């Protein structure tokens, strides 16, 4: 399981196989991808 601990930070839960993290990053943070570290793509 991967934690969504990225600097953009509206999600503090666990990135599972569901779309919760993806949707929140895309919908609320205007991310291009579902990855929650879209602000710093090289920082994981």
UniProtKB/Swiss-Prot annotation:
Predominant cellular place of this UniProt entry's protein: secreted
Disulfide bonds: 15-36
Subcellular location: Secreted
Annotated keywords: Antimicrobial, Disulfide bond, Fungicide, Plant defense, Pyrrolidone carboxylic acid, Secreted
SMART domains in UniProt: Knot1
Stored Pfam families: Gamma-thionin
Pyrrolidone carboxylic acid PTM positions: 1
Biological process according to GO: defense response to fungus; killing of cells of another organism
Any Gene Ontology CC annotation: extracellular region
Protein family: Belongs to the DEFL family.
Quaternary structure annotation from Swiss-Prot or TrEMBL: Forms oligomers in its native state.
Function: Possesses antifungal activity sensitive to inorganic cations.
Protein name, entry field: Defensin-like protein 1
Organism annotation: Brassica napus
